Amino acid sequence: MTPLIFVTGGVVSSLGKGIAAASLASILEARGLKVTMMKLDPYINVDPGTMSPFQHGEVYVTDDGAETDLDLGHYERYVRTRLSRKNSVTTGRIYENVIRKERRGDYLGATVQVIPHITDEIRRCIDEATAGFDVALIEIGGTVGDIESLPFLEAIRQVRTERGAEKAMFMHLTLVPYIAAAGELKTKPTQHSVKELRSIGIQPDVLLCRSEQAVPDSERRKIALFTNVSERAVISCPDIDVLYGMPLELRRQGLDELVIDQFKLRDKVAAADLSEWEAVVDAVKHPLDEVTIAVVGKYVDHQDAYKSVAEALKHGGLRQRTKVNLTWLEAQDLEGSDMAALQGIDGILVPGGFGDRGFEGKVQTSKYAREHKVPYFGICYGMQAAVVDYARHVADLDAANSTENDRQSPHPVIGLITEWRTATGEVEKRDEKSDLGGTMRLGLQEQRLKPGTLAREVYGKDVVAERHRHRYEFNNRYRTQLEDAGLVICGKSMDDTLVEMVELPRDTHPWFLACQAHPEFLSTPRDGHPLFIGFVRAAREKKAGGKLLKEARA
């Protein structure tokens, strides 16, 4: 039976439960334990796939094609375990499963209720996702006191009652606000948050106290007294300059020791080796170079919509001790402009998106980068914009477009994928009338790279696998025509049916590459990703006038 650490949040949302949980997971992993993570989200959507990026932020995609909460991105950036559909569960999915069972007659005519049927299904999902691991951390979304979270909190209360403290731990993240007028930290919100938690039968074992500054020992003692938590288990989580330094901070305060002692794992663990995290923090704090990258997107007002892209760019810089400054530009604002906003930029990245709003701005951005020899990296919709630009302005295919935006285009160089083969070999089919949710080409797919291309050089191997999330694809009817016009198709699906990656010849552009997949989902601070590392290096070379004076590695 896998020991479980349940992470809840109190007082306010957005305190960083996911980061705190992932940081602890990374420490436990560094001590030799096999660790997994899970997110329980209280919203009624089956998954975040159809939710607005402005409201929910990024949709993170796993290897098996699950569209999940962006917190799973945090988890995979901190731990080596690759997560799946099992690791992201919503209220919508739970109710969908229960209703399906009820329709099949699995409950033998019983009245289906929140307790025990909904809570039992939650517990079943937890068991399924965590089996076979030394420790599992499970984050419960929302804030204690929300009505939506109650079934999840009741389910984890039952788990603790059944398994005992040696197999289930409660960790509560709460806010300790600093009141500037009084010049002091206030512990009352934390006391009330724990009181709320205890009223539904959950006594925290550990408190993580988020604050602007370190919580002094006197306040920690006060919190311990009023919440019935050991003073040793009241952990200060102040704001820090480098988020990837959180594992080091929690290790310094002995949070992992609390877990090991409560779960009696002493004979399974080794000394914590956090040297990789120390190297990451050192690279952030002591850069040797600096570049500015423009991200031209549709949802830049809510930058969480591009969370993995922003992190992957920073990771690409970390691997060569380079600080990456991001300039966020709204694609729609660039339509019909003189593109002055892109002057002085070292590199341009155009990320994914859906719909016609801002697409012409992305096409103009691709044209600007191509003509001005600025390093260009297109992802998903960014690749489609690059293909449309090339078709219109180089291949003389006037009014070329994607059928997503213009179904009457005389040259639909981007079209709906109607059929493709999944990673498991199954054939999937779609049409214009298919549901939006869960109907895209999703998950990890292999592709073969063309020898002698920039893509092949950057990756350093012939076959690579990337995660996908898209409904439209390069139209094969235009392959030959665009290749004859000079576009290099440098990556194709293993069955040669889908164009995965395009680039410009290096004798016409120093670094212009666009991919249909989402490589940002496989980038981590400790390893980076070949495409992002190569892109940042190209930006450094542009800034240095074509030749780097000094190579730097983290």
Curated annotation (Swiss-Prot):
L-glutamine binds at residues 353, 381-384, 404, 471. CTP binds at residues 13, 146-148, 186-191, 222. It catalyses: UTP + L-glutamine + ATP + H2O = CTP + L-glutamate + ADP + phosphate + 2 H(+); L-glutamine + H2O = L-glutamate + NH4(+); UTP + NH4(+) + ATP = CTP + ADP + phosphate + 2 H(+). UTP binds at residues 13, 186-191, 222. Pathway: Pyrimidine metabolism; CTP biosynthesis via de novo pathway; CTP from UDP: step 2/2. GO terms for cellular component: cytosol. Keywords: ATP-binding, Glutamine amidotransferase, Ligase, Magnesium, Metal-binding, Nucleotide-binding, Pyrimidine biosynthesis. One of its GO terms (biological process) is 'de novo' CTP biosynthetic process. Mg(2+) binds at residues 71, 139. Residues 292-545 form the Glutamine amidotransferase type-1 domain. SUPFAM superfamilies: Class I glutamine amidotransferase-like (SSF52317), P-loop containing nucleoside triphosphate hydrolases (SSF52540). ATP binds at residues 14-19, 71. The active site is at residues 380, 518, 520. Residues 1-265 are annotated as: Amidoligase domain. Allosterically activated by GTP, when glutamine is the substrate; GTP has no effect on the reaction when ammonia is the substrate. The allosteric effector GTP functions by stabilizing the protein conformation that binds the tetrahedral intermediate(s) formed during glutamine hydrolysis. Inhibited by the product CTP, via allosteric rather than competitive inhibition. Catalyzes the ATP-dependent amination of UTP to CTP with either L-glutamine or ammonia as the source of nitrogen. Regulates intracellular CTP levels through interactions with the four ribonucleotide triphosphates. Belongs to the CTP synthase family. NCBIfam families: PRK05380.1 (NF003792), PyrG (TIGR00337). Homotetramer. CTPSs have evolved a hybrid strategy for distinguishing between UTP and CTP. The overlapping regions of the product feedback inhibitory and substrate sites recognize a common feature in both compounds, the triphosphate moiety. To differentiate isosteric substrate and product pyrimidine rings, an additional pocket far from the expected kinase/ligase catalytic site, specifically recognizes the cytosine and ribose portions of the product inhibitor. This is CTP synthase. The gene is pyrG.
